[in-house]
């Protein structure tokens, strides 16, 4: 029999249905010479540092750097049962070969290989590589299974990525956490992404706006401008000189321009536009397209390609027709698609651009959640736009000369709306006000025309600071590691991959280093402080992008994994050596985040409010006051923060309403600290005489 292992149960069910494996078992399905099971994502992961040595359970500076000589892997605790199922199936004598059917990408390969190796399996396996979960795509994929060894380099790159993240994350996080006494999470990709947020925030906070003035002259529907005049006095002088005077059309240029249709969506571009149009976070969009993929309504979403292959032309035409019939927004739209414009075999590696599938024909779109309908509309719109006609317009540039000053204006007239007609239809459905196009059509004039008695006016303006990143603009920056110099034909060296960028943004928010304000992503105080204390080799987007590029080269067989990891280890060791100690002032950069209520009577260190206690901040000191200690509990009292503060401040506190089983009434007493330095703090009572 053949054992097929998918990444998750829903995908396994789709595959099992096609293969005829319809008999349900505990953790798998069986039938038609196939056993189909699944992984629940990562079942096996790199072991924690404490698995290598018990002393690593405590975070100590002196243990750094931690670099395993031989890597260990462990089964994820809450997924142990499914690993047992897979391990048993791999050892089943009926099974002669396997099919890796996890997601067709770097992480999917890693998920399968780690389970395969951890289970000690040596049976041959083939690779299912598909871009859709439609029945026809699954059948086609099983008819063209590939030798699993063809993907050894992909696995090597995935494992190298995982090890590099472990080395940088474990050592960087422990190093700066022990130095600053606050958990500071450092990540190979997460930290440089945070650095971009901090850099932008710094530019905004230090920005000094400058005032400038524009002078406008015109008559009737024609107005031209002289921009960026430095002083109000000069602007007013120019306006006064031109008021009621004659202006001449000194130059008139007309040019026909075209705007090519946009490319199809890859994941990052889709996430950006879903954020711009709908306000979806990158993670929300990823979750939605993954759901639609599993519903067989979209092709594989974690792609970095914006093209399809030439053998998909007929399918693309069919899907365009289905989109116009099935998505109400585009009903009645009729286009003659130019499929050649979105076809380029050389720009499709693992997966083609994201498209709706022919399965959409059978779907009642109105029955889908609104969020899924929005994503389908967005992808449908892009498909129609990308294969539509060019947008053509005539641009007119006019210069007016008046009293020795040149005033300029631009206008345009649409010649052929082309693909923009579909985009406008989509934008109109959003019911949000679009910004007015600054270039409107101009009245007809000719060079040399005179305008008598023009009016002149002055407007005041200010230079504007850079804008905070949104998920749209941050994803764009991550694609190029903050380098804006890439053109469309340059291979980008970015931060992370399309599949991981959403998770990176979420980690920054969950760790408290960034926060969402409306659509903006803003670094927190801790986020800014973290970037300030970290060295450039950790915060540099360019360096991290080079690492990501090396991983791609490992995948292609052009770089050595051992050399890559050696460089990561060397950098980590240098990092630890560069931070042997901190001054007391620097160590308090992040503060404690804890409430101090007094000084320890044993060592003089601050005493903080804890969970159910008040404890000495000195780890070598055991002084602690418990809210529900036996002394106070026996008197039906709780040691409150107010009582603790007085005990630390004066050594005693007057407490009222104390209980004793010997008498029916409550009593008052002075309670004093009677601390002998032992494990528990003692108290004694004094009564008024």
Question: What would you call each of these model-derived segments?
Answer:
Residues 9-16, 33-36, 40, 76-87, ...:
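Amphipathic alpha-helical transducer elements in NTP-driven molecular machines
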Residues 221-223, 253-254, 324:
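Phosphate-rich ligand and nucleic-acid binding surfaces
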Residues 149, 232-265, 271, 542:
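Metal- or metallocofactor-binding catalytic centers and their adjacent structured scaffolds
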Residues 1, 101-104, 181-183, 254-263, ...:
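Conserved short loop/turn motifs at secondary-structure junctions
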Residues 1-162, 166, 454, 465:
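Intrinsically disordered, low-complexity regulatory segments
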Residues 93, 135-217, 254-258:
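C-terminal or mid-to-C-terminal helical accessory/interaction module adjacent to the motor/catalytic core
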Residues 2-3, 90, 173, 206, ...:
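Basic, low-complexity terminal or inter-domain segments flanking catalytic cores
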């Amino acid at each position: 029999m053949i054992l097929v292992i998918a990444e998750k149960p829903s995908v396994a069910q789709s595959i099992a249905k096609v293969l005829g494996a319809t008999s349900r078992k505990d953790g798998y399905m069986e039938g038609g010479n196939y056993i189909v099971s699944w992984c629940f994502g990562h079942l096996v992961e790199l072991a924690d540092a404490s698995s290598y040595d018990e002393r690593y359970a405590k975070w100590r500076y002196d243990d750094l750097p931690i670099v395993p000589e031989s890597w260990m892997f462990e089964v994820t605790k809450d997924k142990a049962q499914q690993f047992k199922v897979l391990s048993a199936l791999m050892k089943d004598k009926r099974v002669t070969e396997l099919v890796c059917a996890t997601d067709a990408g770097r992480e999917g390969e890693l998920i399968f290989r780690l389970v395969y190796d951890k289970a000690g399996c040596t049976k041959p396996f083939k690779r299912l590589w598909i871009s859709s979960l439609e029945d026809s795509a699954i059948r086609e994929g099983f008819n063209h299974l590939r030798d699993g060894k063809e993907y050894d380099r992909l696995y090597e790159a995935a494992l190298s990525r995982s090890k590099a993240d472990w080395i940088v994350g474990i050592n960087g996080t422990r190093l700066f956490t022990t130095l600053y006494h606050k958990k500071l999470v450092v990540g190979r990709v997460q930290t440089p992404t945070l650095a971009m947020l901090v850099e932008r925030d710094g530019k905004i906070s230090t920005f000094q706006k400058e005032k400038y003035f524009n002078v406008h002259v015109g008559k009737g529907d024609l107005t031209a401008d002289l921009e960026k005049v430095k002083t109000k006095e000069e602007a007013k002088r120019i306006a006064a000189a031109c008021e009621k005077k004659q202006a001449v059309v000194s130059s008139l240029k007309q040019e026909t321009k075209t705007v090519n249709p946009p490319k199809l969506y890859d994941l990052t571009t889709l996430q950006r536009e879903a954020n711009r149009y709908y306000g979806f976070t990158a993670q929300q969009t990823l979750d939605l397209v993954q759901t639609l993929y599993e519903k067989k309504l979209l092709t594989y979403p974690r792609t970095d390609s914006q093209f399809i292959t030439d053998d998909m032309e007929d399918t693309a035409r069919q899907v365009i027709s289905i989109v116009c019939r099935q998505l109400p927004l585009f009903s009645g739209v009729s286009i003659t698609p130019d499929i050649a414009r979105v076809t380029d075999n050389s720009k499709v590696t693992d997966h083609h651009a994201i498209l709706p599938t022919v399965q959409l024909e059978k779907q009642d779109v109105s029955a889908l959640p609104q969020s899924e309908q929005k994503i389908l509309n967005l992808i449908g719109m892009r498909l129609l736009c990308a294969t539509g006609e060019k947008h053509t317009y005539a641009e007119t540039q006019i210069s007016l000369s008046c009293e020795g000053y040149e005033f300029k204006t631009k206008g345009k007239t649409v010649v052929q709306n082309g693909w923009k007609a579909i985009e406008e239809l989509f934008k109109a459905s959003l019911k949000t006000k679009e910004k007015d196009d600054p270039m409107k059509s101009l009245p007809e004039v000719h060079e040399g025309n005179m305008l008598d008695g023009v009016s002149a006016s002055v407007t005041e303006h200010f230079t504007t600071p850079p804008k905070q990143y949104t998920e749209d603009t941050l994803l764009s920056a991550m694609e190029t590691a903050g380098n804006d110099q890439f053109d469309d034909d340059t291979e980008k060296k970015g931060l992370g991959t399309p599949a991981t960028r959403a998770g990176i943004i979420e980690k920054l928010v969950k760790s408290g280093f960034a926060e969402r304000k409306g659509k903006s992503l803003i670094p927190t105080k801790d986020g800014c402080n973290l970037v300030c204390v970290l060295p450039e080799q950790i915060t540099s987007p360019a360096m991290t992008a080079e690492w990501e590029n090396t991983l791609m080269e490992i995948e292609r067989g052009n770089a050595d994994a051992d050399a890559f990891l050696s460089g990561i280890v060397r950098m980590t060791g240098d990092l630890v050596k560069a931070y042997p100690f901190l001054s007391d002032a620097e160590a308090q950069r992040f503060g404690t985040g804890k409430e101090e209520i007094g000084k320890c009577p044993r060592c003089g260190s601050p005493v903080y409010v804890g969970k159910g206690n008040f404890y000495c901040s000195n780890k070598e000191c055991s002084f602690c006051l418990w809210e529900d200690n036996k002394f106070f509990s026996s008197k039906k009292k709780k040691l409150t923060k107010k009582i603790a503060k007085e005990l630390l401040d004066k050594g005693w506190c007057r407490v009222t309403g104390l209980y004793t089983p010997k008498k029916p009434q409550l009593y008052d007493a002075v309670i004093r600290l009677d601390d002998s330095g032992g494990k528990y703090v003692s108290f004694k009572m004094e009564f008024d005489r």
